């Protein structure tokens, strides 16, 4: 129990004086006004005051309010005690935190007291305090606490605010008895509680918008350390744990520094949000960064704030792991009962945890890397012993240069990379305990580095770690079913370490200004040569780093069925070996950026680009496919499929005479057969809409055949947007007879193909009705999602050089807001521009849409027409 009263010197006396029990009666309105003034004062003094004083100041102020109202409601005349519990009990009260109180009573509460308690609590709500309260006798307190560890934890931090001291004195000693909670049971319960919380708050969503309290490495992890030790040692503060040798002084100061930073973030967040909020939503991040003194110019302040945040939660996570394990090994378990086996003269295995046999072992830095090589070599090792963690943390701080400077460390590091299990537990522990930063100073530069956007879910070091883990997963046969092509490639590669090192370095140039891929390529080459890789392998790693974005950009923004696109891509890639490495690196990179954004559509695009390029290599890049031969082949295969379905061949050939040749180049034989069968069986006076039940490239294909009208594309886009579907690809072809063939590939709001047959049938009819309207209906004003409102993406219009002489390629980059594609299509419509294809890509909050267009006369746009279109897009969209 926290027995001492909270006090703080910085609270202006006039606030406390007005709340003195002897002062005048205060109404609800009086207290609300006083609270408002106090909060204004808190905000004004935030930047120059110690956060501990600010938290105590609010607890002191709330104490004064409660004492005043306690007397105004005459509760001081009864045998009842007002006790602060939880964070309020510790004297740590943020601006909008819940005020948790216990009203401790005698066994029986009579009607008069019940009414006074009710009016007291009601007034607390009226003055806008977020009150969490319980009314219990001592017996009821103990009964609930024994059942629920959260109640027990709250009582451990209780502090009397007002009322009868006798009741408090009766309860306090009972909380120290083993019948309440033994150290061991309490420890196990808190560990389970933490494990469940970590599971709940993992993932991209809680990395982009972290919960300062509940996230792994957050405030709750610091509190868990304190609670466990408090239960065992009866300590009231982290500082007391140093006296018990549970914490070392440097660990205490590290925890204190981490706690102070997280507290300051949470304190500022409460003011910015105007409510009790622990999740650092995008809406608040810029304002919190400004309030904390990071500045307010662009994205940099948020990125600086978050970089420090991610470094701090990594430190807290490490300390939490080490200290809880230390508690279990030194206090809960009996060391003499441990199962110990000798590994070598320097290391041993203690209950499956690697431990040093000599406390001075890490005086030789090479031993740190050797330990991780042993972890890779010994499959029975499950982790690092807390004693060894302590030694390693201290040795890490003593390093005056990177471990990379030692030749033996370089040899062992490459042995870890090359070992079949090296990128399993060994890499995970090297990342978790900052050994990668100790080894490679360049890695330290990216540790915790965030980009203020919705696309990159992880800090650069965490993303790079995930990419390496993805690449390693491809080498393991038990994961073959997840990514069969990647697994097949990686398991045949003679030197997978080339691929792994590309994963290490692909983003290491970020944050330095300039092209991060080129900067990283230089770093990678230097690293590889210093680690005795051959010149060929070193150049391969450097090439992969420099071109690591090439395949994703080509697959998502270009027509990968266009032989010119494949030829250009193939010329850069050079050969099948480079293609194999690049494909696997690209899949691992895209999956490791934000798992919620990876989908079958992207997977299929990459795979199709891979096979198209592989085919081009095997036929020879210098030998382009003969167009007439390709058309003839597609027609023959489509006709064979149609004949199987007994479709009249003459009707099909008559239809084909209406099509231009690009139709037979841009669709597969299967698509041609399905589309043409439906067209010849359909009444041409009405639009034909087909929504394929079979996923196409991981999406759903929406096919339209209708009389050509200027607004067909714009009308379809606006319709699909209202159905909350995202468009990823579009092809538009006109026939010689005044009809248009439009194909869209769409995904639902979960990034999945449409599954509901009823829904697709209903939607087909609704789209037919929409296409039969003379004019496009006015769209309702789209609402921007909550998390998008703080982002600004300046509109950029770029014209891209392509081979086709009668086409123009335009790239439009803008904020990915609802209705953007509809707006763009409307501008094209009004500018009398024909759309032939569209590749729609989103990178978090940024839309990057590429269109192939032409004039009404089927020509490429002139320079003057390009300038006019760019201006019009800027005026309408920006």
UniProtKB/Swiss-Prot annotation:
It comes from the Bacteria. Residues 343-700 are annotated as: Uridylyl-removing. Its EC number is 2.7.7.59, 3.1.4.-. Keywords: Hydrolase, Magnesium, Multifunctional enzyme, Nucleotidyltransferase, Repeat, Transferase. Its cofactor is Mg(2+). One of its GO terms (biological process) is regulation of nitrogen utilization. It catalyses: [protein-PII]-L-tyrosine + UTP = [protein-PII]-uridylyl-L-tyrosine + diphosphate; [protein-PII]-uridylyl-L-tyrosine + H2O = [protein-PII]-L-tyrosine + UMP + H(+). GO terms for molecular function: [protein-PII] uridylyltransferase activity; phosphoric diester hydrolase activity. Uridylyltransferase (UTase) activity is inhibited by glutamine, while glutamine activates uridylyl-removing (UR) activity. HAMAP family: PII_uridylyl_transf (MF_00277). Modifies, by uridylylation and deuridylylation, the PII regulatory proteins (GlnB and homologs), in response to the nitrogen status of the cell that GlnD senses through the glutamine level. Under low glutamine levels, catalyzes the conversion of the PII proteins and UTP to PII-UMP and PPi, while under higher glutamine levels, GlnD hydrolyzes PII-UMP to PII and UMP (deuridylylation). Thus, controls uridylylation state and activity of the PII proteins, and plays an important role in the regulation of nitrogen assimilation and metabolism. Has four distinct domains: an N-terminal nucleotidyltransferase (NT) domain responsible for UTase activity, a central HD domain that encodes UR activity, and two C-terminal ACT domains that seem to have a role in glutamine sensing. This is Bifunctional uridylyltransferase/uridylyl-removing enzyme. It comes from Colwellia psychrerythraea (strain 34H / ATCC BAA-681).
């Amino acid at each position: 129990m926290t027995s001492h009263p909270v006090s703080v010197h910085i609270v202006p006396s006039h606030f406390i004086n007005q709340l003195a029990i002897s002062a005048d009666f205060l109404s609800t309105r009086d207290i609300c006004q006083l609270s408002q003034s106090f909060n204004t004062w808190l905000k004004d003094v935030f930047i120059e005051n110690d956060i501990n004083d600010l938290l105590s100041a609010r607890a002191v102020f709330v104490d004064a309010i409660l004492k005043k109202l306690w007397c105004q409601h005459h509760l001081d005349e009864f045998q009842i005690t007002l006790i602060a519990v939880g964070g309020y009990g510790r004297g740590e009260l943020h601006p909008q935190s819940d005020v948790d109180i216990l009203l401790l009573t005698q066994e029986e509460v009579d009607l008069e007291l019940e009414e006074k308690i009710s009016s007291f609590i009601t007034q607390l709500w009226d003055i806008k305090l977020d009150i969490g309260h319980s009314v219990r006798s001592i017996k009821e307190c103990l009964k609930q606490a024994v059942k629920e560890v959260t109640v027990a934890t709250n009582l451990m931090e209780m502090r009397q605010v007002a009322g009868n001291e006798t009741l408090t004195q009766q309860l306090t000693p009972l909380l120290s008895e083993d019948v309440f909670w033994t150290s061991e049971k309490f420890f196990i319960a808190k560990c389970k509680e933490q494990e469940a919380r970590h599971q709940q708050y993992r993932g991209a969503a809680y990395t982009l918008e972290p919960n300062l309290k509940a996230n792994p490495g957050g405030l709750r992890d610091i509190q868990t350390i304190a609670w466990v030790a408090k239960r065992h040692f009866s300590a009231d503060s982290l500082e007391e744990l140093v006296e018990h040798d549970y914490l070392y002084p440097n660990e205490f100061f590290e925890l204190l520094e981490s706690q102070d930073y997280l507290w300051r973030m949470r304190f500022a967040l409460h003011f910015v949000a105007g409510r009790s909020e622990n999740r650092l939503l995008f809406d608040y991040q810029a304002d919190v960064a400004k309030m904390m003194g990071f500045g307010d110019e662009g994205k940099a302040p948020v990125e600086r704030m978050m970089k420090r945040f991610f470094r701090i939660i990594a430190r807290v996570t490490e300390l939490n792991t080490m200290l809880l394990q230390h508690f279990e090994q030194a206090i809960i378990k009996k060391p003499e009962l441990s199962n110990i086996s000798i590994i070598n003269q320097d290391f041993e295995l203690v209950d499956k945890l690697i431990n040093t046999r000599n406390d001075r072992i890490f005086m030789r830095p090479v031993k740190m890397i050797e330990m991780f090589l042993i972890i890779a070599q010994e499959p029975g090792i499950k982790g690092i012993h807390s004693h060894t963690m302590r030694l390693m943390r201290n040795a890490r701080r003593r390093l005056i240069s990177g471990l990379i400077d030692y030749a033996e460390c370089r040899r062992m590091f490459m042995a870890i990379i090359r070992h079949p299990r090296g990128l399993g537990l060994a890499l995970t522990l090297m990342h978790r305990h900052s050994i990668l930063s100790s080894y490679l100073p360049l890695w330290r530069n990216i540790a915790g580095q965030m980009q203020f956007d919705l696309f990159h879910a992880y800090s650069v070091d965490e993303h790079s770690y995930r990419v390496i883990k993805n690449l390693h997963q491809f080498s393991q046969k038990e994961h073959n079913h997840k990514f069969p092509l990647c697994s097949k490639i990686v398991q045949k590669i003679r030197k997978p370490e080339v691929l792994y090192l590309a994963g290490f370095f692909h983003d290491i140039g970020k944050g330095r200004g300039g092209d991060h891929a080129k900067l990283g390529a230089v770093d990678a080459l230097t690293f590889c040569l210093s680690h005795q890789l051959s010149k060929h392998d070193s150049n391969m790693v450097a090439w992969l780093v420099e071109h690591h974005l090439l395949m994703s950009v080509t697959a998502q923004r270009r027509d990968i069925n266009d032989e010119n696109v494949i030829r250009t891509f193939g010329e850069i890639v050079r050969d099948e070996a480079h293609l194999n490495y690049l494909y696997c690196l690209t899949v691992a990179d895209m999956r490791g950026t934000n798992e919620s954004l990876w989908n079958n559509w992207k997977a299929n695009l990459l795979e199709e680009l891979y096979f198209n390029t592989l085919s081009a290599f095997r036929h020879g890049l210098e030998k382009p496919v003969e167009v007439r031969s390709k058309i003839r082949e597609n027609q023959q295969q489509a006709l064979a499929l149609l004949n199987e379905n007994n479709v009249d061949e003459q009707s099909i050939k008559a239809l084909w005479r209406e099509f231009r040749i690009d139709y037979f180049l841009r669709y597969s034989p299967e698509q041609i057969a399905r589309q043409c069968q439906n067209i010849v069986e359909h009444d041409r006076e009405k639009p034909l809409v087909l929504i394929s039940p079979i996923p196409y490239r991981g999406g759903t294909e929406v096919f339209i055949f209708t009389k050509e009208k200027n607004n067909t594309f714009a009308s379809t886009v606006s319709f699909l947007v209202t159905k909350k579907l995202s468009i990823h690809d579009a092809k538009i072809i006109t026939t010689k007879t005044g009809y248009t063939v439009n194909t869209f590939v769409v995904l639902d709001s979960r990034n999945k193909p449409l599954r509901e047959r009823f829904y697709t049938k209903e939607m087909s009819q609704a789209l037919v009705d929409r296409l039969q309207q003379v004019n496009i209906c006015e769209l309702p004003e789209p609402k921007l999602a909550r998390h998008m409102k703080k982002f600004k993406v300046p509109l950029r219009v770029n014209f891209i050089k392509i081979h086709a002489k009668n086409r123009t390629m335009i790239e439009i980059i803008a904020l990915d807001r609802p209705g953007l594609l509809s707006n763009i299509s409307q501008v094209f419509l009004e500018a009398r521009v024909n759309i032939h294809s569209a590749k729609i890509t989103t990178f978090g909050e940024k839309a990057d849409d590429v269109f192939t267009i032409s004039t009404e006369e089927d020509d490429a746009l002139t320079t003057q027409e390009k300038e006019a279109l760019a201006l019009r897009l800027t005026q309408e969209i920006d």
